[in-house]
Amino acid sequence: MSDDEFYYPNRWGRGVLTSGEEIIGKKSMAALLNLAGLPELINNYPPDDMKKEFPFTSVSKIQQAFWDMYGSSDAQVFATRAGEATFNAALNQFGSVAKAAQLAMSAGSPEARIKIGLEFFAKFFNTVSDQKVRIEDDDDYWYWVTERCPMCWNRTANEPLGHLGVGVLKAAAAWANGGETFRIQEHKCIAMGDKEGSMRIEKPKKKQA
C-alpha cells in the first residue's frame, strides 16, 4: 500500500458523512467517527464544495468503522446509499456536465447510451478526484475498473469493499437509462489482493430475432 495521500472533493466526503448520519443518527455517527480515529469531523463536516481536500484515508477509515460497528451487511447498505448520494451530489453541482452527458447519450441503443454515460462519468471522476478509473466491456458486461480506490485504501479484506462505488454506479446507470436498474457486482478488489478493483454491470439481454 502507498503512503501517498490522495483526495476526494469535499462535497463527496460530506455526502458519505451525511448519508451515514441519516442511517444511524447523529450520536451514533459521532461514536463512529471516534472509532475511526476522526474526532475532528464530529459536528465539523467538510464544506459543500469541490475542492480536493477529503483524504482517501478518511473515506477508508469511515468505511472500516462501519464494518467494525455494524458488521458487513449493514456496512454494505450504508456504503451503497452513500455512493448514490455522491452521484446525486455530483449531478446537482454540475448541471452542465449532466446536460452534456445527456446530449451525448441522446442517440443510439440503450447499450450504447450506457457505455457513453459510463465513459463520460469515468472521465469526470478522474478530473475532479484523485480516484482513477477506466471503462472496459465484453459481450455480457461493462467493467468499471478502479486503479486507485479510496474505499479500500490501506485496507485488507477477504470480501469486496467497494460498495460505495456500487452505489455510485447504480445511480449513474439508472440515470443514464431512464430509471432502469442493472445488476452490478464487484468481482475484484484491491483489498483482497487484486491488482485493480473491478465492478461489472450486466448488459441487457439481446432479444432473439
Model-derived segments and their meaning:
Residues A36, D48, A82, A90, ...:
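Amphipathic, positively biased hydrophobic alpha-helical segments used for protein targeting
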Residues S2-R11, G15, F125-V166, A174-A209:
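Short terminal or interdomain "cap/linker" segment that borders an active site or interface and mediates
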Residues L17, E21, L118, A122, ...:
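Generic solvent-exposed, charged/amphipathic alpha-helical segments
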Residues L38-Y45, T86-L91, K188-R200:
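Short, mixed-charge aromatic SLiMs
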Residues I23-I24, I42, I62, I114-I116, ...:
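Weak global preference for isoleucine
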Residues S2-F78, T86:
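N-terminal low-complexity or simple alpha-helical regulatory segments
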Residues K51-L164, K188:
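Amphipathic interaction/junction segments at domain boundaries or subunit interfaces
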